Amino acid sequence: MANAKRITLYDLQLASGCTISPFVWATKYALAHKGFEVDIVPGGFTGILERTGGRSERLPVIVDEGKWVLDSWLIAEYLDATYPDRPTLIGGPSVKTLTKFLEGWLWRTAVTPWFGCYIKDYRDLSLPRDHAYVTSSREAMLGRKIEDVQAGREDRLPHVPPTLEPFRQILRESKWLGGDRPDYADYRALAVFLWTGSVATTPPLTADDPLRDWLDRGFDLYGGLGRHPGMHTLFGLKLRPGDPEPFTKEPARGGLASRNTGPASTRAETEMLTRARAAH
């Protein structure tokens, strides 16, 4: 088994063929990280149980030499356990815990508001045979008509980018969440933005957002894995008078953002505090 070169992946796709599920995106990157060739089984939101032979109602699912593995986290753990000779995805229990924390924060901070901003696009871009299912299931989830949920998104979209500042700060200090090389933390976080790009018919981030460097590098990994032609650009959000600043223009100062190596390293913060005290 350790010499297996190909793994089958059951995908969740839009009409364009672009993957919509962030969990499938994370698994695609995990398989690429491990160096596997992937045989894709296409499909949309409906018919999953039939496609998987009654084994699962949710995706992703992989098949590795006859062994079926469900759930994106369980798949990543399976790949590390079964193929320890290939690059590691999850470096240990602490990495797994911190990755889950970051992913949960991103879902609360970005996915939840963006889901409401793109829910009609989410339905309209799905396979035509899936429209009725997406409409009924998401309206039951949200308690309102899809069109009503998405309405007014131009007023809501500008309020999401400022909330991502802690994430930008991490990436100002590190090339990848995994350090010098991407790991499963990067893939789980990238999956949030890949999901967004699959449905974002109007951009959620400004053109100059500092996240662009990490996102572009992440989408370019493994031969441009995140560059499906069905993807929409994430960048180009137009701000209006009164909209909040999308990100901090100056690097943060202080203990959370810099290391104390002596007075020279803290001078800028000290001068700022001195000016503030004098102003009062």
Locations of the language-model features?
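GST-like domain detector, emphasizing the conserved glutathione-binding G-site
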Residues: 1-133, 248-280
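Acidic carboxylate-rich catalytic motifs and surrounding loops in phosphoryl-/glycosyl-chemistry enzymes
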Residues: 41-47, 180-182, 231
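A short, terminal or domain-edge coil/loop segment
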Residues: 58-61, 90-105, 141-154, 227-245, ...
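Short, hydrophobic secondary-structure boundary micro-motifs
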Residues: 87-91, 177-180, 205, 227
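GST-like fold's C-terminal all-alpha helical module
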Residues: 107-216, 252
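Long, positively charged, glycine-interspersed low-complexity recognition regions
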Residues: 196-280
